[in-house]
């Protein structure tokens, strides 16, 4: 079941973009969307969660740069598929990883040597009420983005938004430096403006279960000059 809280801001944003098709043209792109969608691991065993980091999907099969912005525009919403951990699993994660499940978007500007700089953040959202569903959050304020930037998922505590047991050609990166990939409880989220972090750690056979809604910048309609007689 898909839930869509606070639809009004998203509906208004999309309506504003599409209201004048004769004057300008914009696309709506779901960044990161692939079919079939991945299923988060919880409550199955092992019930694994994304924890205390910022991450993005690097590859799914032959598809690379899955979370890279394809065109200039604005991010207006994001969607996350959540597993449904049991009561004991939820309590375990809450106790070990800093509290209630929550997440937000982070926009990254990739730099050299697997480093990325934080450009913007979405509002943090509590996820527990939506366990077992796919939920869409409209942003209170849309985020302007540029082609080549990356949409990442920031999880300050934990989120049951990880599909596991996939092929070795599927992988995601986290904002953890060399030598720290096994440490998934230390806080490494990238939440400060202009913060630079290294995305050294690559986790194979797993997929982050989120996407982001991009409304591209409108392109003025081209008109054919009228021919003059004579």
What do the predicted segments below correspond to?
Residues 50-70, 134-137:
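Short beta-strands within extracellular/lumenal beta-sheet-rich domains
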Residues 185-221:
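Compositionally biased low-complexity segments at domain edges in trafficked proteins
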Residues 27-47, 96-192:
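Aromatic- and Gly/Pro-enriched, solvent-exposed loop/edge beta-strand patches characteristic
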Residues 22-26:
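Sec/Tat signal peptide C-region and signal peptidase I cleavage site
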Residues 11-21:
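Bacterial N-terminal signal peptides
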Residues 221-228:
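Extracellular mucin-like PTS domains
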Residues 1-11:
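Bacterial N-terminal signal peptides that target proteins for export
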Residues 68-88:
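Extended extracellular/luminal ectodomain segments enriched in beta-structured repeat modules
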């Amino acid at each position: 079941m898909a839930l869509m809280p606070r639809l009004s801001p998203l509906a208004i944003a999309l309506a504003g973009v599409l209201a004048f098709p004769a004057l300008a043209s914009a696309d709506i792109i779901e960044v990161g969307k692939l079919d079939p969608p991945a299923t988060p691991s919880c409550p199955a065993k092992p019930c694994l969660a994304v924890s205390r980091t910022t991450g993005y999907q690097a590859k799914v099969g032959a598809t690379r740069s899955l979370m890279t912005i394809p065109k200039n525009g604005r991010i207006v919403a994001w969607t996350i598929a959540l597993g449904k951990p049991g009561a004991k699993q939820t309590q375990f994660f809450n106790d070990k990883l800093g509290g209630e499940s929550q997440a937000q978007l982070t926009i990254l500007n990739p730099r050299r040597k697997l480093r990325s700089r934080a450009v913007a953040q979405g509002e943090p959202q509590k996820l527990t009420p939506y366990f077992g569903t796919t939920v869409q959050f409209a942003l209170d304020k849309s985020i302007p983005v540029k082609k080549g930037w990356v949409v990442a998922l920031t999880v300050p505590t934990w989120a049951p938004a990880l599909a596991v047991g996939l092929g070795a050609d599927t992988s995601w990166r986290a904002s953890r430096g060399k030598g720290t990939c096994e440490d998934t409880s230390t806080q490494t989220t990238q939440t400060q403006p202009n913060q630079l972090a290294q995305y050294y750690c690559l986790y194979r056979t797993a997929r982050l279960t989120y996407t982001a809604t991009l409304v591209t910048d409108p392109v003025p309609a081209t008109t054919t000059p009228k021919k003059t007689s004579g």
